[in-house]
A protein has these predicted regions:
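Intrinsically disordered, charged low-complexity linkers and terminal tails
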Residues: 1-141
Length: 141
């Protein structure tokens, strides 16, 4: 069985930012492995990664995206600009964003830091609605 190919961060960023381009108060400040944007005079750093099953057998209820260690994250850690880690569920065409105040302190803590989401919630998203869900997971820093 061939291994599934997931879109890379650059492709995910392009697709996401393309959806925002017609918003009147939207600006791309810079775009590399991390996007730096401004919306309504508020700045954000964005990093994109696909959400996949946690392990085998799959699909499991718990999905995850892994945030890698990156040199570019060092300056972001020191910045006051919020960092948004945005996962994309290819199968359900849904974006997941983890709480910035929980993500930013974990930047570059390990080679990869995992963030989890629930498949059942992703499957039940209704187009045009923003669903806010808080799920508590234990993690090892």
């Amino acid at each position: 069985m061939a291994r599934r190919q997931y879109p890379k961060g650059e492709e995910l960023a392009k697709s996401f930012l393309n959806k925002l381009k017609n918003y009147p108060n939207f600006e791309i400040i810079s775009q590399s492995d991390v996007c730096h944007i401004r919306i309504d005079n508020n700045e954000y750093f964005l990093y994109f990664k696909c959400v996949t099953h946690e392990g085998k057998p799959y699909p499991l209820e718990r999905q995850r995206a892994q945030l890698p260690k990156r040199e570019s994250f060092e300056a972001i850690k020191k910045s006051i600009v919020p960092f948004l880690f945005i996962g994309y569920d290819v199968d359900n065409d849904v974006y997941i964003c983890w709480e910035p105040s929980k993500v930013k302190p974990r930047l570059n803590k390990k080679t990869y830091v995992s963030f989890y989401s629930r498949l059942s919630i992703q499957r039940n998203v209704v187009e045009g609605e923003i669903k806010v869900t808080i799920a508590l997971y234990r993690y090892h820093a």
